[in-house]
Each structure stands twice: as C-alpha cells, then as structure tokens.
Amino acid sequence: MNERRYDIDALRAIAMFLLIFYHLGISFTSVAPYIAFVQNKRFNDGIWYLLSVMNSWRIPLVFLISGIALRLAFQRRTKIEMFKERTKILIVPYIFGSVTFGAASLAIAFTYYEGWSDEYLWLWVITIFDGIHLWFLKNIFIYCLILIPFLNLISNKTAKETIFSKILNMPGGVFLFSIPVILEGHLLNANAYSEVVNYGRSYQEYANTSHGFLLGFIWFFLGVLLVSQGEVFWESNKRNWKTHLFVGFACYFYRFFNNFEDGFSLDNRLISFESFNFIFLMLGLGAVYLNK
C-alpha cells in the first residue's frame, strides 16, 4: 500500500484529458448553445457517436480516482493534514477557476450569442457558487469532509482480509460492487421528472444535480473502500478487465441500437452498469499496462 501507484497518476491525467476532449467536442454539436458553449460554425451531431462512448463514465471515473487518491494519501498523513491538504488542492483552484475561467467562459458564450453587456462583469458572483465547469471540485471537497473523519473505520490500514476482499477474490465478485451504482440508476428512473427536487433527467446530467452528487459520492466511497483491500483489488482489476471490456461494449451497443443519443428513454440501471464496466476496464488496463 505504500508503493506509489503510477497507474492511478496516469488515469487521473487521462480522466482530465477526457473531460477537456469532451467539452471541446460539445462545441461541434447542436447542443452547444443550450449549455453556454460557443458553437462551431461547422457542427455535426455525428460526433455524439464518439462522445457517447465516454459520456456514462468520464465523470464517475474522476470521483473514483479521487476516492482512491484520498485513501492512498491517508497512509502517510494525519486527518488534520488531510483536511488542510484537501482544502488547498480543491477549494483554492475551485474559487480561482470559478471567478476567472468560469466567469470568462460564460461571458464569451453570452457575448457570442447575444452581444456584450456590462452585467457580464458580475458573472463571477454566480460562478463562485455554481462552479460552472469546476462543480466537481466542490463535490469532492464535500465528500472529503464527510469521509475523512471515518477513514480509520474504512481504510483497513492493517491489510487484513475483509468481506470485501473475499468478494473481490470470488469469480465475478467484483460485479457485486455495481449494486449501489445500479440502485442509484433506479432512483434516477423514479425521480427523473420530479417537480419536487432537481434530481436529474438523464444519466449524463451530473453537474449541480442531486443525481450527480449522490452518484459521485458512491463512486468516491467505492474508491476509498476498494483500494483499502490492498493487492486483492489490483489483482481483481488485472484479472477481470477483458470481461469488463466485453460487458461494457455490449451495454453500449444496446444503447447504440436503441436511440442512445436520447438517454431519456433508456433504463438508467443499464446505463449505470455500462458505466461500471467501462470504469473497471480503465482500472484493469491501468493496473496491467500503466503501473510501471
């Protein structure tokens, strides 16, 4: 557990690249004007075929890796040090990025579509609370505040065999950890069109929704819990990545042939299971090829 995981470093960089690539791709679709993106004059919704491959798991992967990173950092730090460090690496970038890049991106988009207004100079007042593209940093910080006090109970520092490590050693046992993710998908099914709470309408609607917050917490917690099982977790990833590859693409192609662009009509429990498999595919590929 004390060894540095180069695969997690690499996956963190890959996850950030995918976020940037996805947001760049949005500008080439017809969706761009509706979510305050500057739309390219030559847009083509055919790019959704590529974007939809990653759309169900790109954000959950970020939360999982953040949970893994928190647990690995806890091996060498006290809880107080963890609080201070997480405040420094999450809240400072969140505030700075929100009032600068976040506000600027909105001002540019609004100016592009509607023309300049002096009111845009005050957009930072909104973005510091909303976060815009950095909303996930706010969520991760809240998850840290919730879980750091309980890390001693969750983290299994002595690397003893637990019920979770036994499950990971079982053939197909890793799929049991998809249950909370699938249950959240079921919750989304039940509340997608609720007028009482902004739970979220589609699986990919992560930003500033109850769906995105709860799903992010589940993946963050799984990151802490599973990496605490030590080598058993990494060996499970190495052993099962081909299975995750097959199941993930099977779910994706089911979406492909059933109007995958419009996620509103699809069962979110299936999408959540697809997401689970692609995420563990990435973990498996990382454990096999990137931890060097």
Q: Where on the chain are the PLM-derived regions?
A:
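Alpha-helical transmembrane segments and their immediate juxtamembrane cytosolic regions
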Residues: 1-292
